[in-house]
């Protein structure tokens, strides 16, 4: 299940540079993090849903790539984003 339009708009407003900034790296990582967190709750109930688990692993990989890109380009923005999202790195 994907995020609602309202949830996406809230994330874009919080992490974007303006209300229509859906393409910046920070927004993309925040949207992927929200989807990943939503799917983790799904897997607590549906342990054998391997088809969706593959999608989850793909999202985690995409988020990792975006975070690596951001770390290469701007370490300060990377550190700020990690702290705001509460990721382990």
From Swiss-Prot:
Pfam families: Ribosomal_S15. It comes from the Bacteria. SUPFAM superfamilies: S15/NS1 RNA-binding domain. InterPro entries: Ribosomal_uS15, Ribosomal_uS15_bac-type, uS15_NS1_RNA-bd_sf. Keywords: Ribonucleoprotein, Ribosomal protein, RNA-binding, rRNA-binding. One of its GO terms (biological process) is translation. One of its GO terms (molecular function) is rRNA binding. Gene3D superfamilies: 6.10.250.3130, S15/NS1, RNA-binding. GO terms for cellular component: cytosolic small ribosomal subunit. One of the primary rRNA binding proteins, it binds directly to 16S rRNA where it helps nucleate assembly of the platform of the 30S subunit by binding and bridging several RNA helices of the 16S rRNA. Part of the 30S ribosomal subunit. Forms a bridge to the 50S subunit in the 70S ribosome, contacting the 23S rRNA. Belongs to the universal ribosomal protein uS15 family. NCBIfam families: S15_bact (TIGR00952). This is Small ribosomal subunit protein uS15. It comes from Edwardsiella ictaluri (strain 93-146). The gene is rpsO.
């Amino acid at each position: 299940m994907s995020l609602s339009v309202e949830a996406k708009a809230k994330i874009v407003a919080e992490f974007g540079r303006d209300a229509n900034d859906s393409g910046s790296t920070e927004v993309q990582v925040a949207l992927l993090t929200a989807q990943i967190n939503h799917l983790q709750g799904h897997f607590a109930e549906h342990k054998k849903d391997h088809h969706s688990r593959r999608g989850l692993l793909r999202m985690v990989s995409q988020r990792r790539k975006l975070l690596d890109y951001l770390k290469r380009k701007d370490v300060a923005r990377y550190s700020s984003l990690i702290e705001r999202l509460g990721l382990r790195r």
